Amino acid sequence: DERRRCLGADRGGCPPGRSASPLEAEAEADDPVPVGRAPWNPLLDLHRRAQGRAGAREQAIARYGFAVPNDEALDLIVAWSPEGVVELGAGVGYLARLLADRGVDVVAYDKDPPPSATNRWFAGREPWHPVLPGDEGVVGEQTQRTLLIVWPTRDETWPADAVEAFHHAGGGRLVYVGEGPGGRSGDDRFHALLGGIPRCLACTYGVADAVCTCGAPVLWRRERTVELPQWHGYTDRAEAYTATRQPAPAGRRPSRLPWRRRRL
């Protein structure tokens, strides 16, 4: 059988060896945007057509990634990255590809770059943009760039370690794409360093699955927020930060829990 054409193949195409899913093939078949008239972003097209379909988000994640970047979010990252981007946890490099198409110098890293079989989300997938092997230890060598972290894992410490190491090495700009405190991306310490958790929830409220954030300084100040196209039940967004060179201490105890923890 003839292999389905990948969505957007005539605008820059699929990774080598990848065929289109049924959802992609449908979106390509009735895509009203003439070739060459709009920036290449097949995930945005797929999201518009696939909302509400069973398994659509899971298929989109496996091929592209967790976040659905729109023009506003891409414009924010471009504007926030005058010296280029270093992306950590880049997955299949879809967002890196979109930024590179817009003229941004992007260096993308992942601890287990696809198609590595040890990558639990993207095993066997060819990347859209070159993704190098690397963890939070590489960011200290890229401080002139903007650090980009998209949907970091909630049950690991590397996201917090990365934003802390980048700050201490002199990095000045950060873009985070994901959910807020209590959401499904980034642990409590990560969000505390970004100023999103005013008090240690583990010690103050006895939240059993919370990470102790006592003494965690606020290293980053949020400057801008852009809403993203969201899958049903998810609340991710793009946030731009600048480094605080006199880190603020944790704030006073809030009167109630500011959020409830959600499942991935």
Identify what each model region corresponds to.
Residues 154-226:
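C-terminal substrate-binding/active-site "lid" region of AdoMet-derived donor-dependent transferases
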